[in-house]
Amino acid sequence: MGEAAAATEALARIQQRWGVGVIRRGRVVTDPQLRGLVVRSSGFAALDALLAPRGAPDGLTLLRGAVGSGRTTLALRTAAATQAAGGAVAWIDASHTFDGVEAAARGVQLTSLPIVMPFDINEALETAGSIIAADAADLLILDCAGVRGEARVDGLERLAARARRTGAAVIALVDSAEGVLSDLALECSTVGWLRIGSDVVGRKMCVALRSGPRRDAQVLIDVLEPRSAREAIRNERIAAE
């Protein structure tokens, strides 16, 4: 079965069990000839230089940080870069915070992105497992920020094992990675701001690669806010005239 057909079947099963409204929009689209070759870039060259040749590794990557740390921005950029490389991406919004306008501004192709809004973490993990088991995505992003408990820990580790077997990558957005075994852990924090004149147009973000409690490496990246930057540049030009 081709990847597009597998994706369609997997999403149909999800809708049959949880209801049509659980999937908001989009579909999985990819070139099956690219399976196993898709580069899951972070969208930031400095960070990619620290990662494996294909970017996010097979299995589970934990993307953790406080609200406003840039973790969602990094996930969106990774989704956009993976789509641009021909990969299939799915997004499971267990925290119910997905912003389509922000995603589009970060380059995500919303018409090619299934967005699943599960009722709870158990439904989120079961849905994620169905997508991975169907070999229907190169990259699956699971936003479970704010969710805690043993069900999350056990479910993430089972999901990671499935992803390794199928050659897929799972990126989980979490507040805390305590107790979860992962293939990679990235910790995000905002360490400064980017300005044009007096306008804030982005942030300076630190991404640390961690192995257990130890910090292995870190990189500083600049993240522009597209709309703020455009408005600030326009204001600067008007002021100069």
Task: Place the predicted regions along the sequence by residue.
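Detector for small/aliphatic-rich hydrophobic stretches
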Residues: M1-W91, I238-E241
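Helical mechanochemical/support elements of P-loop NTPase systems and associated helical scaffolds
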Residues: E3-A6, A10, V39, G43, ...
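Signal for well-folded cores of large energy- and translation-related assemblies
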Residues: L51-G55, Q83, G129-A136, R164
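Aromatic/hydrophobic pocket-lining residues that form π-stacking "cages" and hydrophobic walls in ligand
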Residues: T78, A128, L159
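Hydrophobic/aromatic ligand-binding patch that stacks against planar heteroaromatic rings
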Residues: A81, E102, R162
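Conserved inter-motif catalytic segment of the P-loop NTP-binding fold
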Residues: G86-D154
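Long, charge-dense, solvent-exposed interaction surfaces that engage phosphate-rich ligands
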Residues: A145-S182
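Phosphate-binding/switch region of NTP-binding enzymes
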Residues: A168-E241
